[in-house]
C-alpha cells in the first residue's frame, strides 16, 4: 500500500479529532465492532476460530507508525495470501494519542481481508491486559501477535499469551521490533499446522467471519 494512502488515512484520522455533527439516522453500518470493557465479544470471536491461525493487533487509529504497520502487513501477509480461511485477524483500536471511535473507520481500510474484524475499545483495557501477559511495566499498544491454532482464551480476566509477537514501541526488546517479512514468515509456519479442509469447513459454518 502506498505511503500516500497511509498519509491520507492519517490525515482523515486527525480531522476526525475535531468536533463533528451527529451521524444521520440512515448512516451505513459501522465497519467495526464496539467492545465493552469485558472484551466478551472479542473473546467469543477468538474462541470461535480455534483451529485457525489468529492474529491480534493492538493499534492506535491516529498513530502514524501503527498505520504504517498495518499497511506493511497488508503487503507482506494479506495481499499475498488472499482470503485464506485458515487465518483470522482481530484488529483492536485503542484510544491512544487522543484517538476516538470516529477514527476507526478510516484506519480499518488499511487491512483488506474477508477474515479480518476491526474493533473499537474505548477504555484501553486491551493494552493493559496484554501488558500483564508479557510482564512489562508500560502500556502495550502498537503490538502485533500471532496465536497458534490450539490456543484457547479460557480466562475471562486475562488474555492468552501470544505464540509470537512483535512491537513498535520504545522500551520493549529491540530484537522483537516489527519486521513485516519476518512476521509473514512466522504466519506461514503456523499455517502449515492447519488443514485447509478443516478451516474451510469451519468458515462455512461461521459465515466466513469471526463474529
Predicted segments with their positions:
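Solvent-exposed loop/turn segments at secondary-structure junctions
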Residues: 61-65, 94-99, 122-126, 151-153
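Loop/turn elements at helix/coil->beta-strand transitions in domains of secreted/extracellular proteins
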Residues: 51-54, 84-89, 112-117, 141
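Short active-site neighborhood of thiol/selenol oxidoreductases, capturing the structured segment around
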Residues: 49-64
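Thiol-/selenol-based redox modules, centered on thioredoxin-like
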Residues: 142-211
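Bacterial N-terminal signal peptides
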Residues: 10-21
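Short, internal strand/loop/helix patches
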Residues: 108-138
Amino acid at each position: 500500500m502506498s505511503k500516500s494512502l497511509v498519509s491520507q488515512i492519517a490525515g482523515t484520522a486527525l480531522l476526525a479529532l475535531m468536533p463533528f455533527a451527529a451521524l444521520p439516522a440512515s448512516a451505513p453500518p459501522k465497519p467495526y465492532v464496539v467492545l465493552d470493557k469485558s472484551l466478551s465479544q472479542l473473546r467469543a470471536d477468538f474462541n470461535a476460530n480455534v483451529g485457525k491461525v489468529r492474529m491480534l493487533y493492538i493499534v492506535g487509529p491516529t498513530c502514524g507508525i501503527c498505520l504504517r504497520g498495518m499497511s506493511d502487513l497488508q503487503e507482506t501477509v494479506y495481499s499475498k495470501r488472499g482470503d485464506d480461511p485458515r487465518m483470522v485477524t482481530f484488529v483492536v483500536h485503542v484510544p491512544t494519542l487522543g484517538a476516538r471511535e470516529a477514527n476507526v473507520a478510516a484506519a480499518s481500510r488499511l487491512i483488506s481481508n474477508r477474515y479480518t474484524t476491526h474493533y473499537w475499545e474505548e477504555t484501553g483495557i486491551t493494552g493493559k491486559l496484554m501488558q500483564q501477559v508479557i510482564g512489562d511495566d508500560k502500556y502495550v499498544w502498537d503490538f502485533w501477535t500471532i496465536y497458534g491454532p490450539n490456543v484457547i482464551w479460557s480466562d475471562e480476566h486475562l488474555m492468552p499469551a501470544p505464540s509470537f509477537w512483535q512491537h513498535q514501541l520504545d522500551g520493549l526488546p529491540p530484537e522483537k521490533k516489527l519486521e513485516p517479512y519476518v512476521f509473514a514468515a512466522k504466519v506461514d509456519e503456523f499455517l502449515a499446522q492447519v488443514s485447509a479442509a478443516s478451516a474451510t469447513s469451519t468458515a462455512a459454518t461461521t459465515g466466513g467471519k469471526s463474529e
